[in-house]
Amino acid sequence: MIKKYFTISIIKEARIDENRSPFTPDQIQVLTDKFPNLHVFVQPSKKRCFKDEDYAKAGAKIKEDISHSDIIFGVKEVEISKLIENKCYLFFSHTTKVRNYINQATQDKAIIYKKELLREILKKNITLI
């Protein structure tokens, strides 16, 4: 059976200091107008720089469960526990980024987390764009 529509979703960012979004409501409006077979879902968020209502007015559906999505968009790394098997994600993983950390312990913790994230991505057969 051939799917007649394509689904994208915007995740709720997990980091406390992150309020950005990969798409503005205006961009969602342009996409849904141009591609009527595109379904857009947005996980609800109180801290995102755009309101859920603005996304809804632009044609997105506000929904916590985005497991049905073809591509899941985010800004920062998705929490390991929130990764969905066999999905395609587009977010900045910084998995190979080298930076100066405040101390060695902080750097070691970041490296361990990034390795764990990559292992889980491979284990869950996730495509990371």
Listing of model-derived features with the role each one plays in the protein:
Residues 45, 67, 94:
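Residues that form or immediately flank small-molecule/cofactor binding pockets and catalytic motifs
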Residues 1-2, 64-66, 82-84:
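Solvent-exposed alpha-helices and their adjacent loops that cap or buttress functional pockets
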Residues 58-69, 78:
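Short acidic low-complexity segments
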Residues 71-129:
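Phosphate/diphosphate ligand-binding glycine-rich loop within oxidoreductases
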Residues 1-61:
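N-terminal glycine-/charge-rich "phosphate-binding" loop or analogous flexible N-terminal tail
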